[in-house]
Amino acid sequence: MRTGWATPRRPAGLLMLLFWFFDLAEPSGRAANDPFTIVHGNTGKCIKPVYGWIVADDCDETEDKLWKWVSQHRLFHLHSQKCLGLDITKSVNELRMFSCDSSAMLWWKCEHHSLYGAARYRLALKDGHGTAISNASDVWKKGGSEESLCDQPYHEIYTRDGNSYGRPCEFPFLIDGTWHHDCILDEDHSGPWCATTLNYEYDRKWGICLKPENGCEDNWEKNEQFGSCYQFNTQTALSWKEAYVSCQNQGADLLSINSAAELTYLKEKEGIAKIFWIGLNQLYSARGWEWSDHKPLNFLNWDPDRPSAPTIGGSSCARMDAESGLWQSFSCEAQLPYVCRKPLNNTVELTDVWTYSDTRCDAGWLPNNGFCYLLVNESNSWDKAHAKCKAFSSDLISIHSLADVEVVVTKLHNEDIKEEVWIGLKNINIPTLFQWSDGTEVTLTYWDENEPNVPYNKTPNCVSYLGELGQWKVQSCEEKLKYVCKRKGEKLNDASSDKMCPPDEGWKRHGETCYKIYEDEVPFGTNCNLTITSRFEQEYLNDLMKKYDKSLRKYFWTGLRDVDSCGEYNWATVGGRRRAVTFSNWNFLEPASPGGCVAMSTGKSVGKWEVKDCRSFKALSICKKMSGPLGPEEASPKPDDPCPEGWQSFPASLSCYKVFHAERIVRKRNWEEAERFCQALGAHLSSFSHVDEIKEFLHFLTDQFSGQHWLWIGLNKRSPDLQGSWQWSDRTPVSTIIMPNEFQQDYDIRDCAAVKVFHRPWRRGWHFYDDREFIYLRPFACDTKLEWVCQIPKGRTPKTPDWYNPDRAGIHGPPLIIEGSEYWFVADLHLNYEEAVLYCASNHSFLATITSFVGLKAIKNKIANISGDGQKWWIRISEWPIDDHFTYSRYPWHRFPVTFGEECLYMSAKTWLIDLGKPTDCSTKLPFICEKYNVSSLEKYSPDSAAKVQCSEQWIPFQNKCFLKIKPVSLTFSQASDTCHSYGGTLPSVLSQIEQDFITSLLPDMEATLWIGLRWTAYEKINKWTDNRELTYSNFHPLLVSGRLRIPENFFEEESRYHCALILNLQKSPFTGTWNFTSCSERHFVSLCQKYSEVKSRQTLQNASETVKYLNNLYKIIPKTLTWHSAKRECLKSNMQLVSITDPYQQAFLSVQALLHNSSLWIGLFSQDDELNFGWSDGKRLHFSRWAETNGQLEDCVVLDTDGFWKTVDCNDNQPGAICYYSGNETEKEVKPVDSVKCPSPVLNTPWIPFQNCCYNFIITKNRHMATTQDEVHTKCQKLNPKSHILSIRDEKENNFVLEQLLYFNYMASWVMLGITYRNKSLMWFDKTPLSYTHWRAGRPTIKNEKFLAGLSTDGFWDIQTFKVIEEAVYFHQHSILACKIEMVDYKEEYNTTLPQFMPYEDGIYSVIQKKVTWYEALNMCSQSGGHLASVHNQNGQLFLEDIVKRDGFPLWVGLSSHDGSESSFEWSDGSTFDYIPWKGQTSPGNCVLLDPKGTWKHEKCNSVKDGAICYKPTKSKKLSRLTYSSRCPAAKENGSRWIQYKGHCYKSDQALHSFSEAKKLCSKHDHSATIVSIKDEDENKFVSRLMRENNNITMRVWLGLSQHSVDQSWSWLDGSEVTFVKWENKSKSGVGRCSMLIASNETWKKVECEHGFGRVVCKVPLGPDYTAIAIIVATLSILVLMGGLIWFLFQRHRLHLAGFSSVRYAQGVNEDEIMLPSFHD
């Protein structure tokens, strides 16, 4: 680590301290990764491998004895190219050499100079051979030193370019059979490179190594104007600390920006990331913002929307937006690009700001080293204060070094040290630039917490300091404050400047103290014992030591020593008095060991403290003499001072503590959040100065908890100022070795410390147990979420923020909070047992139960304090035993529940053991204890809310519920709810994670979306399920797609005004089981109902040793206590493996198993590198995970806990069981990918990443959003490479690859832009190739213009965003990454085959309906064009259809359906024979079939809407039989089909499908005498069958009017005719049921249930009378009558003519009919 305080850099004449110069002089490379020999401390022999086994040999530097620490805590042997490991599956000879990618345990750690590995086996030497023994005490050292093997930990080497986004190297890595333990150089890469994953042969992940280099070549860009070199790591994604370490490893630092000109340069820089880390941070406890390279922070450009003042949940790191130039505070753990910076010229002139100079000033002014200071006690605004100083021929004070800060803090404020005082720093600019009023250059800034906090766009801004610490704060210039004036004084003769010091030569004065260097190297204490009391004194001493060349590496003794070898360092006695340790300045990895003496280093680590051997080590000395008496020490609290209400302490402590554990807080927090939480209360995270203090603290904590808990404490090394050394957040100096050797692991990135509390009551009684195990501290990544403890000095009153709800005493005093329960002690009211129960119940609590030793001890101590040892208190009999999981107690009683029926129970502090073992008189009047469960996590069901039924056979029991899987039906929410009500249940409510897991385990054969019982309006808070249970658990999809969509409302449809929840079944997606919401009026599936049971299910495994099968895997639960390593061995005995969990269904099923066993169970997940990376022990890759949010990854092995989450546990802990498995679906070993493509060189800091035969460039640079249209984006890609184009995705593998890249930048973007355009009325890629593969979230888009954006989201689905709502489109655009792609192989011929409108194949012309339709709608659309839905009858036909679907890119309906109610009897809708099954194995439920682009044939509900269908039109017309129509048949209804005559009957068919009851009604509608067809003989059977085949539609199933009587079991026709002919299928296929159907395809009959299934209908009616013959007779008679009448008329006329004309005219009679003759048409 590089070294440097926040010391100033000065212009010519005012320059930096020497150690800063040394740091700049050369890159700070790490030597920790160099090879070494391993020396056995007892024998002095070195170890080496011989034929894979370890032997001892004489030490030398030959390669066969050289080892090296590599990634994941492995020891790599250079000569054999293997790693030292343990095969714990064998009982003997576990220790040997393994291939470094072996599944054996290869990690090693140090402890007190010993080396241990898996299962706590320790490396030992026995008879000259290496072995592993659990109780070994062998000491191991690095050759040529006294260092432990772990004293110099492995340091990561970070990368750039490549395809790893800055990830560190993974050493060793394997290429072509050779293991490489360092970066390598070859002609295929632009510089030394390394692999970044263990399995390079498969992953192909690599990057260019970032190592120290002199000058600014290769990876750097020079800028003469600013005298700097810049490294733009654009295509990387690291946390702030990782980025800082990466820069430091190269002798550089994270970017600091010191002027508007430099800011402009960065904004105008091409190829810079849009968002990237800068060195600005507030990581040093109790200090403000500062640059990591310690340059002054006087130029600012904060984003007003992300202010610099963090809140409780705020952030202490800063990033820059390159487009706006604005700085934003941001979570330090976010993964972002970064910029490093280092100076062009390392030569710096040095100046001395600490040399004493005697100065003369006017009366009242304070002289100091050439200047005079005046603190003016009147208050004025800044401008008036400035004017007053000018009137004194001076100026407001300017501060340029820590020497100036010391004057302010130690000399100007003797009384009121907390007063605020103006200094001469002021800003009048935008962006902010603070400048000194006296015109001197700003070389130091010293900001207070959360400062500088400059109001946005408001000037001027002025600065004050606080006298106590001298730290600065931005104020309104109108504030009235005191001020300090400063002017030059008269320097006196230098010869007399040290007149207060002894006359001997060499004494130097600093303040009121004199110092002298003795240049002879002597053992500790020979000359004097130096005490160092402050940072300022340390800086002065650094100045004294600066002349010693760092190459000589001199040391100077201090007076700090661990006299008792207990690890506690104190100042040696001086003048009979021992000063308290008030300041510490430890070096990297110090204090290293107990019993030593402390010396200060020179060189690059000037002034840093290191532990040395007091006798053998020799160093120079600095002696110190005070010119006056020792000053008084700061007053500290007294042990008997009180603690605030709700805070606790222990007798010897000077502090009060408050534990914030999971049951009492909203959430666990990372270290920074926890520290800010404490600060808001006026406290800090806990700190300690003495070993005994932390012991007592941990004993205190064990009374608060059972089990194991990690709690944040104030120890951290977050700030770059600390250079890798530890500090307490409340400024308590570090004087005690409380950090075990494991603190050295992954030292660069584990910057915060936590303490482990684990309850081991049996050990408290034994004096000889090892305290070091009890005091267990560990470093963690600071973003880990843990519980914490706040600490405040005794006697101080904490603050009470608005959001904080402090503990307050009730009417019975303050409660006792233990393990999530509140205990109230009712001492002033004595009641009998029953009265006590009722009293507690009336106050919303219960009579207390005792279920753990922690609770027992806390209650015992509490009642002893309240009422003495003998007073008895009522408690309640526990249903469960005390600590029933605890198996190590000395007493047997705890193993069994106390069961005395209705007997009563009390206890006292003195005789509690006897009291808990016997009943007593329930009428006795006693005080009592009430218990209230914490509702956040321990709420229990109210006993009166359970349903009054138990689970019947069809219902699946789980806990207090029954679940029923029903046939999926697509319904609205209310219909779905009614459906479950009809079964006597409700839609499921999900009340816990374990219930969620159980439901998820039922999902594999269910639909993609299922209703659950959650319903609410958009204007109300969701708080209850439809079964009236409280909403205590939720599992909404984290992306919550519907949250971005508007759910339409229909004013006339009440359901649409409500939102209802769905559970998502996304197959193997990690989001399977999560919830979404939609309009309640939409149709989704109901497949699962629930009801409550009176009796909670006591599901247990009848025989725990038997295997259980789920999906394709066999599982075995081992129900016995064992460690992780033992569990692995047990599984191997059964030829099984510790389980690897790779999908959400498997996870859910095993979570339920863990609950049923009520045990945490080992799984095969473990880490070899202190939780940085986890992998499965069977070698499978970790794709799916279920980490507990509250656990953090704190240990190396993993259990599946009873709550369904993964939690890390010490591998050597005993757990109550393990899960073994045997996979029945073992896939082939992962095939090594071959990337033969060579990509172009990086462009503008952005590398091209190879995948398959393409190269990709993911653009996260600034101004990437300036390209808004597809053409502009394409132009941007063309500038990168003429062959590139905007991203297209051809298949699922490529989709997954692009998703993987996007997830690296999930802090910056939510989508990758897709190059999809709208041309020629269809969507296509920008290169005009069709979308042969798609993954749209909502199916086929309905886009009809170019006004849209498309992107791949962080869950892998494609989203489309139109420009209808411009704000959403802008958000989509600004949160997208642009991606360019070069296809190194011409894919156009392969992918440019646009799907034709018509496609001939065999005897048909095929086409695709490209719109969303149901199966029935698709059938109708095909029929309207004279065609059918597609059918397939051989493999070639299947391949043809699959090719159509693949080219279309969407799932399409085909003509296959089943309508017999069983979803198993499928038919082609075109009437062709179902003679070829295109799918294999089981498929999803559903009665219609579609084909998806992956070639999968899926069963779906026919009324579900899909993305289209395949139609075909026959090219050959079908030869049809001649049909006979007769007028003796009933007339056809309007627009209806005609009746067909066959023999003596008329027949009419219908194209629709009907149930049996519908069929009967339909026939009577056609004609009142018509019935469902009856068949009397074989000819009629053939006629009806032929009629159906020639008029095929959907199915060949035809209802017959034949039914069976329930009484005599006889069969009869509906038309009443006798059954004279039947044609049943053979008995094995004829079916069961009381109704019948004709199967027209094979002309046989089948018995079916009348209520199930659908079929075609043929109606039958007898032939009517022959009306034509009758009409002919009538007509003939009419003609004869007419002819007779005519003859009579002619006769009469002739008679009159003969007789002469008559006077009487013919008149028609009123009763004569007119007869009309109808015309006849044959």
From Swiss-Prot:
Matches recorded under CDD domains: beta-trefoil_Ricin_LY75, CLECT, FN2
PTM note says:
N-glycosylated.
Organism ancestry: Eukaryota, Metazoa, Chordata, Craniata, Vertebrata
What residues are glycosylation sites in this protein?
N135, N345, N377, N529, N843, N865, N934, N1076, N1103, N1225, N1320, N1392, N1593, N1626
The miscellaneous remark of the record is: Isoform 2 and isoform 3 are produced in HRS cells by a transcriptional control mechanism which cotranscribe an mRNA containing LY75 and CD302 prior to generating the intergenically spliced mRNA to produce LY75/CD302 fusion proteins.
What this protein is called in its record is: Lymphocyte antigen 75
Annotated localization = Membrane
Sites of the modification Phosphoserine?
S1703, S1719
GO molecular function term, any single one = carbohydrate binding
The signal peptide annotation in the UniProt record is: 1-27
Q: Which domain of life is it from?
A: Eukaryota
Say which species the protein is native to: Homo sapiens (Human)
On this chain, the residues bearing Phosphotyrosine are: Y933
Which segments cross the bilayer?
Answer: 1667-1691
